[in-house]
Amino acid sequence: MKSLIIFCSILLIANTSKAQFKFLANNSSDQYKAKIFVDKCEGNACSGKATVIVYDKVTDREVDTFHSEDLDFGLTETQNAKLGWLELGKYQTPLIFGDFNFDGLEDLAIRNGNKGAYSSPSYDVYLAAAENKFLPNSELTKLASENLGMFDVDKKTKQIAIHQKDGCCFDKTINYKFDAKNIPYEDSSVIEDSSIADIVTVITQKIVDGKIKRTVQKFKMKDYYNQ
């Protein structure tokens, strides 16, 4: 019986190792580095189920482990995933580190498929918690998964912004702030509608003293996009 258990363990390790490609993400954060194990790499594209292990850069201590159903990212023509432990560039990695909720701690977004609008990238978002652990955040994951890719982070205004699109001529940006309970709420939005002739209609909405203030402006297309 003992021999059977040992054999099964060896077989499991062998199959896991064969099925996964290994990468390093050492340049995405000043505080953290990561090892990435992903199921599939074909040509210049990697995807599928993946495990991400995050380490402290200074101490090499393992901080947390994450899983993604579809860790989708690309490789350059000179990178060969079969070599193992391939180091990914800062803007190539499927991991995004940053202070998303402006509490002074570095948070993490992990690529999980292309579930955004027009098949744009989607991300699972984790906020930093006590003892360097990360907690999943459903509100920010929704914002990073149902719009045009990852939200923008503006440190100066302490806002995050998502982008939406409907066809060729309708674009919307929604800006969010965080309340006392660290929950994002819509603070303002800008709609750009260029569906009528050569006119761009810009509709701005902002919450002022609990009320929505709305302004509508019209511009010549050539003037608006040359500003």
Annotated model-derived regions:
Residues 17-62, 155-227:
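Acidic, small-residue rich beta-repeat scaffolds with periodic aromatic anchors
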Residues 1-22:
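Bacterial Sec-dependent N-terminal signal peptides
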Residues 99-112, 156-161:
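Acidic/hydrophobic-patterned starts of short beta strands in beta-sheet-rich repeat architectures
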Residues 55-58, 119-139, 174-180:
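Beta-propeller blade repeat segments, especially FG-GAP/WD-type strand-to-loop junctions
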Residues 66-86, 192-207:
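Surface-exposed loop and turn segments in beta-propeller and other repeat-based domains
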Residues 64-68, 135-142, 186-193:
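Beta-propeller fold detector
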Residues 26-28, 89-102, 152-155:
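Structural signature of eukaryotic scaffold interfaces centered on beta-propeller domains
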Residues 72-93, 142-152, 170:
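Repeat-based blade/solenoid architectures
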